[in-house]
């Protein structure tokens, strides 16, 4: 069951004195009910903006040079993927439109197999590290108890191997845009 229910997309603008604006857009992923879906979401997050080879990082930071940082984060408890961007106030429209355009590219499979392979390798390395991280193992155990969804790291790693470009595209098509939050100065 998803903790947060998708509703109509909302925009929230907040003004405070600061040196750079922060833009956060959420996408509802729905409940993560099995290891295949979990693996696809982990790979999507890495491809999207969760790593330096991510589509948004390369487009917004390296290609266009309009943001200070780009990140994405999956909250599997609430079924939400957050995309965070630090940018100047004047670049809000360009950033927002670029994110929408990048999602359209993901939906139509317009990303390279090389990036998919890279993302899968990163996720698998993190899962290997997780085997030896006591705190992470405790968090996984607690989340398994809370959600009644057992995360077996070795099986999750096998599922990551099987994620395809088509899986990523289907996931991108299923995302529902949620709240957009823009914190900026005047």
Model-derived regions: residue spans:
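Alpha-helix boundary/capping and short turn/kink residues
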Residues: 53, 108-109, 150, 165
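Non-catalytic beta-strand/loop surface segments
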Residues: 1-35, 46-97, 156-179, 186
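Regulatory input/activation interfaces that engage signals or partners
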Residues: 39
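C-terminal regions of mature proteins
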Residues: 117-186
């Amino acid at each position: 069951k998803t903790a947060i229910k998708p509703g109509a997309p909302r925009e929230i603008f907040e003004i405070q004195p600061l040196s750079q604006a922060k833009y956060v857009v959420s996408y509802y992923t729905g409940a993560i009910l099995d290891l295949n879906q979990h693996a696809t979401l982990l790979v999507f997050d890495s491809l999207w903006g969760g790593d330096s080879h991510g589509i948004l990082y390369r487009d917004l930071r390296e290609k266009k040079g309009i943001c200070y940082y780009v990140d994405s984060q999956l909250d599997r408890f609430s079924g939400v993927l957050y995309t965070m961007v630090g940018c100047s106030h004047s670049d809000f429209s360009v950033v927002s439109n670029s994110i929408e355009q990048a999602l359209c590219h993901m939906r139509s499979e317009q990303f390279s197999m090389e990036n998919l392979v890279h993302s899968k390798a990163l996720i698998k390395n993190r899962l290997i590290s997780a085997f030896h991280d006591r705190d992470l193992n405790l968090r996984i155990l607690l989340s398994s108890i809370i959600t009644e969804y057992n995360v077996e790291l070795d099986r999750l790693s096998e599922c990551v191997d099987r994620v395809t470009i088509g899986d990523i595209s289907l996931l991108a098509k299923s995302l529902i845009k949620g709240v957009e939050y823009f914190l900026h100065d005047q």
